[in-house]
Amino acid sequence: MKVKASVGKRCEYCKVIRRRGKVYVVCKVNPKHNQRQG
């Protein structure tokens, strides 16, 4: 999970999710794409 100021989809399988006021990008196909906005 990378913590970045600016998050976004990196492939077609990434999903943008909001949890507890934070923005996450979750990707099951390529876990390297997992990000959290911080």
From Swiss-Prot:
One of its GO terms (cellular component) is cytoplasm. Keywords: Ribonucleoprotein, Ribosomal protein. Pfam families: Ribosomal_L36 (PF00444). It comes from the Bacteria. Signal peptide: none annotated. SUPFAM superfamilies: Ribosomal protein L36. GO terms for molecular function: structural constituent of ribosome. GO terms for biological process: translation. Belongs to the bacterial ribosomal protein bL36 family. HAMAP family: Ribosomal_bL36. This is Large ribosomal subunit protein bL36. The lineage of its organism: Bacteria, Thermotogati, Thermotogota, Thermotogae, Thermotogales.
